[in-house]
């Protein structure tokens, strides 16, 4: 599966647009790690626990988006974007979305 954030795929011709595809996941940190992250935020610097959590969430959202595109018969996804939002205290949703296409 080819993924790109552009409107075309270099070296390929889009022959069919299959529409919007998306994948999302909601993640929360373990309370112990959340406390550690809170303490780290007081002194400043990167909060590695949340960096790792969001990286894992983005990867899962991409996998789910790719699965939806494959179900539609796509071999590429163009205009890939990410959206992140807080859905409740200490939990975040990550969504990946784009346009499923067939390229040759």
Swiss-Prot record:
Which Pfam families did the record assign?
Answer: YbjQ_1
Family from the record: Belongs to the UPF0145 family.
Q: What is this protein called?
A: UPF0145 protein DET1617
Which species? Dehalococcoides mccartyi (strain ATCC BAA-2266 / KCTC 15142 / 195)
């Amino acid at each position: 599966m080819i993924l790109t954030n552009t409107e075309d795929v270099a070296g390929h011709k889009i022959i069919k647009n299959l529409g919007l595809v998306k994948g999302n996941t909601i993640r929360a940190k373990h309370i112990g790690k959340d406390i550690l992250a809170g303490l780290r935020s007081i002194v400043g610097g990167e909060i590695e626990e949340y960096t790792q959590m969001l990286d894992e969430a983005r990867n899962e959202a991409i996998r789910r988006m790719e699965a939806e595109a494959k179900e539609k018969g796509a071999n590429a996804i163009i205009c890939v974007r990410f959206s992140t939002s807080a859905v409740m205290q200490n939990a975040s949703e990550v969504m990946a979305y784009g346009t499923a296409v067939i390229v040759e």
